[in-house]
Each structure stands twice: as C-alpha cells, then as structure tokens.
Amino acid sequence: NAIADYRTFPLISPLASAASFASGVSVTWADGRVSPFHNLWLRDNCPCGDCVYEVTREQVFLVADVPEDIQVQAVTIGDDGRLVVQWDDGHASAYHPGWLRAHAYDAQSLAEREAARPHKHRWMQGLSLPVYDHGAVMQDDDTLLEWLLAVRDVGLTQLHGVPTEPGALIPLAKRISFIRESNFGVLFDVRSKADADSNAYTAFNLPLHTDLPTRELQPGLQFLHCLVNDATGGNSTFVDGFAIAEALRIEAPAAYRLLCETPVEFRNKDRHSDYRCTAPVIALDSSGEVREIRLANFLRAPFQMDAQRMPDYYLAYRRFIQMTREPRFCFTRRLEAGQLWCFDNRRVLHARDAFDPASGDRHFQGCYVDRDELLSRILVLQR
C-alpha cells in the first residue's frame, strides 16, 4: 500500500488463506490469527492509483459512490503475498499483508494496538526530569526524537546550553514546526512591566495555571527560555495535572465528575482584546481518559450553573486548587541563564514565585507550538 502511505509496514505474518463471507472477507494468517474485513471497509481502503492520487497519497475515491451492498466476486492471495479482491463492479484491489495486519480490527489486533498506544507517565514531586543538550537537539534527529517523546509522554523537559541572545528560542521551536502566534506575539518577553497586560508581566507570585485557557484550543507546548535570572526569588513550580486528576478521581470521585462534566467560562480582558472560552476544568477523551486540564483562576469568569450544583462545584474546584499546592505533587526548580523549560501546557500547570525586581534583572522569552505539530513531527521522525 505504498501509494497510500509514506510509512512502511513490516510483514508480521504472511497470509495463509482468504475466503469471502456474506458481507466481507475473512483472512487467516500464518500465525493462526483470523481477521474479518467487511466489503465496504476493503473497498474504502483500496490503494490503487484510481482510488488514491499517487502524488499527494490522498484518497480520491468516495465510498458513497459504490452500492452499499457491493460484493466480492473473487478473493485470492497473489504471488507477492497480497490479498487480491475482485469486485462485482469490475474493480480490483490488492492489499499488502503488512498494511492489512497493521489495520486489522479483530479483537486481538485492536487489543495489541491499544497496548502499544503511547501512555502518559504521570509524575509527582520526585520526577526524574528529562534534560537534553540544546546543541544535540538542534543537530541530531535521534536526540530530537528522544526529547519530543519525553515532551509527549512526561510533559515536562528542560534543555541546557541554549544561547542567551533574544530570539534564540525561535530556531529551536521550529525544529518541531511553526510557532503559534497569540495576542502576546510570536515570542513574548516575561519580565516585570509597569503597564502589564497580564499577571505574568509582574513581579508577584503567579499561581499554578495553564496558559490561554480563554482559547477554544489551548496552546499545546509552551517554551520558557531564560536569558538572565539575577533576581532574588522567581523559582518555577510545576505539577502534573493528569496526576492530580487521577488522585482526585480516586479520593473524591463526585468532585472529579463535577470538574469533568461542568463547563465554566474563562476570560482574558485586555484593553484591545476579549477572549472567552467555556469548557470543563478536566476534559476527557472518547475512552474516558484525561485529555486536557484547563485552569487559570485569574482568568476565570464568575461561575454560571444550576443553583443546586453551585455549592458542590465550589467544593470540587477548591479541592483541585488545594491539591495543586500539596508538596507531593509539586516539582520546583530555579531556571538559570541558558536553560529552557518545554512542557505540555494542556497537561502541566506552572507557577512562579514572587521575585524582587530591584535585586537583579530577570528576563525570560516564551512561545507556543500546538500539540498536533509535536505529534506530527514525532511520526515523521519515526518513519
């Protein structure tokens, strides 16, 4: 199926036999596994040049253009090991056994793929922080991939040896993909400002939060690059929001459900912009796993919900906030010049201790890259 994909699929087991049934084809593999494939599924995934444009490797065939009761006229295993299907409308399809096995949807194949799916490594105070050298990440794709896998699975990483010139962050972020611009710019400077338009641009304590919860899609990755940090105070604290959500689910399941099921509004009220988004603090994916944490108390609108739910929701919200402060979850470090944080902003909450701007200069630069770009880059590097 090379024409339909840029990846290659190893031959785990050859096809031993194939037979049609009323609505599809059943194949038996040499290792004994049996996989059914339905007619519409097979026709929908035909990789031939008439069904897939070989230049873009994108499908041009539409399954709605064939009868829903399309039938197999003949099925064989070709000399090259492919599954060959002759359709009753005269079309022919051939499927590479490696591709077919990788996409089989019998119960055993689905279970294998679920077990091999990347899983988040939840962490607490004792995190063994993944640390990488900036030069190696910039020059070596294997190191780049190792770093990106840590960002994906752990959610918090640090780089050393980053040049301390303003803008040095841009080439690093672009090793992944393009930078996501916001109303704070392509790059944003984190330092104390007299006319601050965000609490981040002050010197006082910044509580644990995710950035831009006011957006429909929060930025996936956040970079914070230290150019100079001579001020007293200003340590960084991180917590794994997924670990806290799991602890809350076990310790207070009713509170967990409220934070998953109840949407609340977040607002960013600037002099020149007004961003608003309504979403739950804890978002789940289709399998019930935590997909996203959305929390910044200083960007939260007054709660609006049924009066009977309000008291319990406040208890749940307070419980989550209190858990972010518990030492068992908190990982605290000071970032020095030439070092950089890269973390999953939709999972990891970050905070900053107050600092004394009169004691020395403190200048960070930051930017965002969407999580989709991270996952795409990983898949390309793994080809």
From Swiss-Prot:
CDD domains: CAS_like
Annotated function: Catalyzes the formation of L-carnitine from gamma-butyrobetaine.
Cofactor needs: Fe(2+); L-ascorbate
Cofactor binding, per record: Binds 1 Fe(2+) ion per subunit.
Pathway it works in: Amine and polyamine biosynthesis; carnitine biosynthesis
Primary subcellular site in the record, as a coarse category: cytoplasm
Domain of life, source organism: Bacteria
Binding locations of Fe cation: 209, 211, 350
Subunit composition and interactions: Homodimer.
Keyword vocabulary terms for this entry: Carnitine biosynthesis, Cytoplasm, Dioxygenase, Iron, Metal-binding, Oxidoreductase, Zinc
Catalysed reactions listed for this entry: 4-(trimethylamino)butanoate + 2-oxoglutarate + O2 = carnitine + succinate + CO2
Disulfide bonds: none
GO molecular function: gamma-butyrobetaine dioxygenase activity; iron ion binding
Annotated Zn(2+) binding sites: 46, 48, 51, 91
InterPro entries for this protein: AlphaKG_dependent_hydroxylases, GBBH-like, GBBH-like_N, GBBH-like_N_sf, TauD-like_sf, TauD/TfdA-like
Family of this protein: Belongs to the gamma-BBH/TMLD family.
Keyword Ion transport: no
Name the record gives this protein: Gamma-butyrobetaine dioxygenase
